[in-house]
Amino acid sequence: VLGLWLFVALATRECALRLAQFGAPGSGWAELGALAVPALVLIALARPSALRRALFGPHDDACRLAGCGPLALYVFTRLWAGNATPGDAAPLPWLPLLNPLEIGLALAVSGLVAWARSLTPPQRAAVPRALPASLAGATALALVTGAVLRACHQLAGVPWGEHALWTSTLAQAALTVVWSLIGVALMLAGHRAARRVPWLAGAALLALVVAKLFLVQLADHGGLARIVSFLVVGVLMLVVGYFAPLPPRRAQAGEAVAAP
């Protein structure tokens, strides 16, 4: 396990230094270098292989948790930190989802998912059931939010900073539309699968959107972008109210099916 950590640390350092030469400090290249090696190691060790048998031997399950767990924690924390950066891709042109930072974030997500799926049932049972789903949902929303804000910064010239993004009519309108679409998608999926948890998660996200509309965008005099935001949210709420009402509880659904 110590040898694995040493290898990952040295390889990550070397990869980060090499890729950082392509851009300025803190660019997307540096983040890609910091995430690529540990994420790829998590992916490589997620499935039974000769490499994993050579590293962990007869203690595969325990060593996979003790050896790869800290790597997964590093990747998770680095993913959140990298998501808060503008992700400059110079000297290459910046492309949504195809820039160094977001490629690194995609590798990180793939590595975390692969590692989580490789855990044994007893190891999964030791973790509260709501915790992985909550972390996954919060991380997914944060990644989508970061991608939208980076697109506004890179493509529309909105300055990268808390105040500038908070007061930008374009950034706030884009977040409103994207969050609303995600909320509606969750509610539709929950209704179709007769599962209340995703439906309630989508409803909570739509409630957050409405609060943001009134607390942030209502005070803004941005004109067209603000009007479009209100119209989109209103139409989506009408759609979801008609096509995806709150699904019944499982017990109630079972009684309804059993009734003649």
Predicted feature locations:
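Alpha-helical transmembrane segments of multi-pass membrane proteins
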Residues: 1-260
